[in-house]
């Protein structure tokens, strides 16, 4: 590793550490604040369930964030071996869609899955990280009563996964940045949806682990399509 590469790596490490500290502080501050109010009997008895629910919600957000940070750190370690097995990507995508169906229903988003039974030699853990974050992102950032199309196919002998939504779209100037760690186009919307800012970064890491690449096609107020080539 030359000096320039070492400096870049060190800068990225420091930025990541600073972002992690900031992201962890937000839910921890909320949990501490709500708990302190309850401890000092400053919450009316009838409001206790509401405050307890807020603490639980922030705790879940914190746990999700910590898990995503661990995943990113593991994917950064090029020496970690994840194992391989033949996976039917279409069936795997259906499993993930089924798990995310309650979220889709809560947001009135219709998810449609189509494509071919494509076999791929890969880690189930990494394929779960790939599909889950792609599909979850398409649901979270969709419009109410929106649609999400998930397609699995094979192009030139390689798996191709497309996730297309009817969301608000991503401005051109941000399209190259949405896979960066903790980058959010709309921070207020991300807070409402509970996003950690690491989902698409995890997708990028998984795709790069398998030597693939990602395309993004987006139009404002029409939607976004993310295409993964493995």
Residue locations for each model-derived region?
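Conserved glycine-rich
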Residues: 211-212
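Short conserved segments within the C-terminal catalytic ATPase subdomain
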Residues: 103-113
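Short conserved segment of the HATPase_c
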Residues: 170-184
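Short acidic helix/loop segment immediately C-terminal to the autophosphorylated histidine
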Residues: 39-46
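Conserved micro-motifs of the catalytic ATP-binding
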Residues: 77-82, 115, 119-125
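Short alpha-helical segment of the dimerization/phosphotransfer core of two-component systems
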Residues: 57-62
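A conserved beta-strand-to-alpha-helix junction within the catalytic ATP-binding
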Residues: 83-101, 152-153
């Amino acid at each position: 590793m030359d000096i320039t590469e070492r400096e870049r790596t060190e800068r990225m490490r420091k930025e990541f550490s600073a972002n992690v500290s900031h992201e962890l502080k937000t839910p921890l501050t909320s949990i501490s604040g709500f708990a302190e109010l309850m401890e000092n009997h400053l919450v009316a008895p009838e409001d206790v369930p509401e405050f307890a629910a807020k603490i639980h919600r922030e705790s879940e957000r914190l746990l999700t964030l910590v898990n995503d940070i661990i995943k990113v750190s593991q994917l950064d370690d090029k020496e970690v071996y994840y194992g391989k097995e033949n996976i039917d990507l279409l069936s795997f995508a259906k499993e993930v869609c089924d798990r995310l169906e309650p979220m889709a229903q809560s947001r009135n988003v219709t998810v449609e899955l189509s494509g071919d039974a494509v076999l791929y030699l890969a880690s189930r853990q990494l394929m779960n990280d790939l599909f889950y974050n792609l599909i979850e992102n398409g649901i979270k950032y969709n419009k109410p009563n929106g649609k999400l199309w998930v397609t699995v196919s094979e192009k030139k002998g390689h798996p191709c996964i497309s996730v297309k939504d009817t969301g608000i779209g991503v401005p051109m100037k941000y399209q190259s940045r949405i896979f960066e760690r903790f980058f959010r186009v709309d921070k207020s919307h991300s807070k409402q949806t509970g996003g950690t800012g690491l989902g698409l970064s995890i997708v990028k890491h998984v795709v790069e682990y398998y030597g693939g690449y990602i395309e993004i096609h987006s139009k404002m107020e029409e939607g976004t399509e993310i295409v993964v080539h493995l």
